[in-house]
UniProtKB/Swiss-Prot annotation:
Gene designation: ARMC8
SUPFAM superfamilies: ARM repeat (SSF48371)
Pfam families (UniProt xref): Arm (PF00514)
Modified residues (Phosphoserine): 337, 512
Keywords, alphabetical: Acetylation, Cytoplasm, Nucleus, Phosphoprotein, Repeat
Subcellular location field: Nucleus; Cytoplasm
One GO CC term on file: cytoplasm
PROSITE patterns, sorted: ARM_REPEAT
Lineage: Eukaryota, Metazoa, Chordata, Craniata, Vertebrata
Descriptive protein name: Armadillo repeat-containing protein 8
Residue numbers carrying N-acetylalanine: 2
SMART domains: ARM
Keyword Acetylation: yes
ARM repeats: from-to residues: 51-92, 95-134, 138-176, 178-217, 224-265, 269-309, 313-352, 374-413, 416-455, 458-497, 501-540, 543-585, 588-627, 634-673
Function: Component of the CTLH E3 ubiquitin-protein ligase complex that selectively accepts ubiquitin from UBE2H and mediates ubiquitination and subsequent proteasomal degradation of the transcription factor HBP1.
Organism encoding this protein: Homo sapiens (Human)
C-alpha cells in the first residue's frame, strides 16, 4: 500500500533518515505480535516532541503499516490503541505530516475504529481524529461523507469525559456554515451537548460552549431552540451569563459572550435584554483592555463589533462604556517600544499578529459609528484617527485594508465629517488609489463609500471628478459582481445630480448608450433602479433635457416603453414615469412624447391605475405637457382632450387621495385658463 507525500521528497530529508528510524519501521513487520506491540510503543516514545523523527518515519512508510495493524482483526486491542496513539502523535507534527496521513486515508480507518466496543481504543481514535480535523489542511467535509458518522458520534458522547471533549472539539471545528449546522442540529446536537455545560471537567464544558457558539452563528433555528433549553432546571442563556462572570477563565467568558451575541443577532434574544446590555456587552468591552492578551483583544473587539452593528442603542451604550473609543486607540500602538512583554516568544508572536489588532479596531469603530453623529465625531477626534485609517488603506494585509475602508465608509455617512475631516485629510486620494486595484470585497465597500463622497454637498466631489472617476465608475458598471454594478451606477447617479452639462455629457460618453440600455435590462433590481435614477438625474433642467434627448431620444423612449410594458414592480414603473415627466418638462423634448401615441396611451393607462404612486407620476407627465405658459400648449391640450384625458382628470379631482385630487384640479385649471 503506497502512501505518497504531496511535496517531493528532498534529498536532504532522505539523508537525515537514520538507521534507528528504519529500525522502528522494520519492527512493525516482525512475525511476533508481542515484538510488533513493543516496536509501536518504542516508536511512540521516540516521536514525542520530535518532528524530525516523525518526518523520517512517514518517509519510510510507517503510516500505511500502522493503519494496516490498526484495522487488522487479528491485532490485539492494545496494539490497535497504541497504533492510534502513534498516528495521533505524527498528526501533531507539521501540516505536511497531516497531508501525508490524509493521503493514506487515515480518516475512514479511524472512523471504522470507533465501532469497536473498547473505550480506550475509541478514545485513542477520537484523539487522533481531533488532531487531524483541527488542522487547517483537513477538509471539514470528510466528517460528513458517511451519513452514519454523526449519529454514531452523538451516541459516543455519553461514554466518557474524553469522548465528550474530543467529539465536541471535532464538531466545533467542522461546523462551517448552515449546511453543517443543520446536519448537527437534526442529529440532536443541542440536546446531546447541553448537559455537558455542567460537566465537572473544565475542558468538556469549554468544548461544549464552543460547539454552541458555532451552532448558533447566524442561525435563527438553532438560536431559538437554545433560548428554551433547560439544563438542571436552568435556562441555557442563564448558564451562559454565569460563564461570562469575571471569576471565570477568560476563554470561557469570551466564548459565552459569543454564544449570547450570536443568539441576539439571530433574533432569539432582544437587544435590550439585560443579559445583553448588562452582561454580554460589558464583558466584551473588558476584553478590549490592554491587560488582555492580543488574541483576546482581537476576539473581544470583533465580537463586540458584530453584536452592536445593527443596533444604535447598543452602539451608544458601548461608546460610553469604560472609555472604549479611547481604549481602542491603544490597538494601534501595540507592541510599544517599551513593551511590558518579557516573554520573547510572546513578543515575537504579537509583532507578527499586531495587524490583527488594527483590523479589529477598525471593525469596531465602523460598528460604533454606523448611525450616531456624536459617536462619529468622538472617533474622528481620537488622536490621529483619520491618519491611521488613511494609513490602513495601504497596508499589505487585505483584511486590514478592508476593515479600514469599512471604517471610513461608516464615518462617511456623516454630512458634517464629509465637509470637514474628509476634506482636511483628502481621503478621496487614497480611496481612488484603492479603487484602481483591489479584490472585489474591498472594491464593493470602497465604491459604496465613493457614492457618499460624490453627494452634491461633499467638497471632495470636484477633485474626484478631476481624477478620472467617471471612467473608473463606468468600468464598475460592467462588473460581473452585481454589488459593484449597483455601486458604479449609484455613484454616477450622485455625480449627475444637479451637475453641469459637461459632466452629464462625460457620463453618457464614457458609459455609452449600449451599456446604459444593458443596465436597464439588468436582472438585478437594484441595478435597474439606480440606472433609472441616473437617467432621471441626467434628464433634469430644460437645456440638459433637450440636449440629451436630441442625441439619445429615440433609444431612451424605446427603453421607457419596454420598462412600462414589462413585468416590473411599482417602484420601477414610478421611477420610469418620473423620467417621462422630466422629458415632458423639456422645451423640444416633449415633442418626443406628443408624437408617440404608444407612450401617450401608457400615460393615460397609468392615470387610471389602482396604485396612487403611479397615478401621481402619470399626472406629473400630463401637467408638464399641458402647462399653459409654454409654446404649443394649446395643440397639446387639444390632442390630450381628444384622447379622453380631461374626463380622467375630472374623475381624479374626486379622488379620496388629497394629493392626487389637488394635482388633478391644478391640471384642469390649465384647461380653463
Amino acid at each position: 500500500m503506497a502512501c505518497l507525500l504531496e511535496t517531493p521528497i528532498r534529498m536532504s530529508v532522505l539523508s537525515e533518515v537514520t538507521a534507528s528510524s528504519r529500525h522502528y519501521v522494520d519492527r512493525l513487520f516482525d512475525p511476533d505480535p508481542q515484538k510488533v506491540l513493543q516496536g509501536v510503543i518504542d516508536m511512540k516514545n521516540a516521536v514525542i516532541g520530535n518532528n524530525k523523527q516523525k518526518a523520517n518515519l512517514i518517509v519510510l512508510g510507517a503510516v500505511p503499516r500502522l493503519l494496516y495493524l490498526l484495522q487488522q482483526e487479528t491485532s490485539s486491542t492494545e496494539l490497535k490503541t497504541e497504533c492510534a496513539v502513534v498516528l495521533g502523535s505524527l498528526a501533531m507534527g507539521t501540516e505536511n505530516n497531516v497531508k501525508s496521513l490524509l493521503d493514506c486515508h487515515i480518516i475512514p480507518a479511524l472512523l471504522q475504529g470507533l465501532l469497536s466496543p473498547d473505550l480506550k481504543f475509541i478514545e485513542a481514535c477520537l484523539r487522533c481524529l481531533r488532531t487531524i480535523f483541527t488542522s487547517p489542511v483537513t477538509p471539514e467535509e470528510l466528517l460528513y461523507t458517511d451519513a452514519t458518522v454523526i449519529p454514531h458520534l452523538m451516541a459516543l458522547l455519553s461514554r466518557s469525559r474524553y469522548t465528550q471533549e474530543y467529539i465536541c472539539q471535532i464538531f466545533s471545528h467542522c461546523c462551517k456554515g448552515p449546511d453543517h449546522q443543520t446536519i448537527l442540529f437534526n442529529h440532536g446536537a443541542v440536546q446531546n451537548i447541553a448537559h455537558l455545560l455542567t460537566s465537572l471537567s473544565y475542558k468538556v464544558r469549554m468544548q461544549a460552549l464552543k460547539c454552541f457558539s458555532v451552532l448558533a452563528f447566524e442561525n435563527p433555528q438553532v438560536s431559538m431552540t437554545l433560548v428554551n433549553v433547560l439544563v438542571d432546571g436552568e435556562l441555557l442563556p442563564q448558564i451562559f451569563v454565569k460563564m461570562l462572570q469575571r471569576d471565570k477563565p477568560i476563554e470561557m467568558q469570551l466564548t459565552s459572550a459569543k454564544c449570547l451575541t450570536y443568539m441576539c443577532r439571530a433574533g432569539a434574544i432582544r437587544t435590550d435584554d439585560n443579559c445583553i446590555v448588562l452582561k454580554t456587552l460589558p464583558c466584551l468591552v473588558r476584553m478590549c483592555s490592554k491587560e488582555r492578551l492580543l488574541e483576546e483583544r482581537v476576539e473581544g473587539a470583533e465580537t463586540l463589533a458584530y453584536l452592536i452593528e445593527p443596533d444604535v442603542e447598543l452602539q451608544r451604550i458601548a461608546s460610553i462604556t469604560d472609555h472604549l473609543i479611547a481604549m481602542l486607540a491603544d490597538y494601534f500602538k501595540y507592541p510599544s517600544s517599551v513593551s511590558a512583554i518579557t516573554d520573547i516568544k510572546r513578543l515575537d508572536h504579537d509583532l507578527k499578529h499586531a495587524h490583527e489588532l488594527r483590523q479589529a479596531a477598525f471593525k469596531l469603530y465602523a460598528s460604533l459609528g454606523a448611525n450616531d453623529e456624536d459617536i462619529r465625531k468622538k472617533i474622528i477626534e481620537t488622536e490621529n484617527m483619520m491618519d491611521r485609517i488613511v494609513t490602513g488603506l495601504s497596508e499589505s494585509s487585505v483584511k486590514v485594508r478592508l476593515a479600514a475602508v469599512r471604517c471610513l465608509h461608516s464615518l462617511s455617512r456623516s454630512v458634517q465629517q464629509l465637509r470637514t475631516s474628509f476634506q482636511d485629510h483628502a481621503v478621496w486620494k487614497p480611496l481612488m488609489k484603492v479603487l484602481q486595484n483591489a479584490p472585489d470585497e474591498i472594491l464593493v465597500v470602497a465604491s459604496s463609500m465613493l457614492c457618499n463622497l460624490l453627494l452634491e454637498f461633499s467638497p471632495s466631489k470636484e477633485p474626484i471628478l478631476e481624477s478620472g472617476a467617471v471612467e473608473l465608475l463606468c468600468g464598475l458598471t460592467q462588473s460581473e459582481n452585481p454589488a459593484l454594478r449597483v455601486n458604479g451606477i449609484w455613484a454616477l447617479m450622485n455625480m449627475a445630480f444637479q451637475a453641469e452639462q459637461k459632466i452629464k455629457a462625460d457620463i453618457l460618453r464614457s458609459l455609452s448608450t449600449e451599456q446604459l440600455f444593458r443596465l436597464l435590462s439588468d436582472s438585478d433590481l437594484n441595478v435597474l433602479m439606480k440606472t433609472l435614477g441616473l437617467l432621471r438625474n441626467l434628464l433634469s433642467t430644460r437645456p440638459h433635457i433637450d440636449k440629451i434627448m436630441s442625441t439619445h431620444g429615440k433609444q431612451i423612449m424605446q427603453a421607457v416603453t419596454l420598462i412600462l410594458e414589462g413585468e416590473h414592480n411599482i417602484e420601477v414603473k414610478e421611477q420610469t414615469l418620473c423620467i417621462l415627466a422630466n422629458i415632458a418638462d423639456g422645451t423640444t423634448a416633449k415633442d418626443l412624447i406628443m408624437t408617440n401615441d404608444d407612450i401617450l396611451q401608457k400615460i393615460k393607462y397609468y392615470m387610471g391605475h389602482s396604485h396612487v404612486k403611479l397615478q401621481l407620476a402619470a399626472m406629473f407627465c400630463i401637467s408638464n405637457l399641458i402647462w399653459n405658459e409654454e409654446e404649443g400648449s394649446q395643440e397639446r391640450q387639444d390632442k390630450l382632450r381628444d384622447m379622453g384625458i380631461v374626463d380622467i382628470l375630472h374623475k381624479l379631482s374626486q379622488s379620496p387621495d388629497s394629493n392626487l385630487c389637488d394635482k388633478a384640479k391644478m391640471a384642469l385649471q390649465q384647461y380653463l385658463a
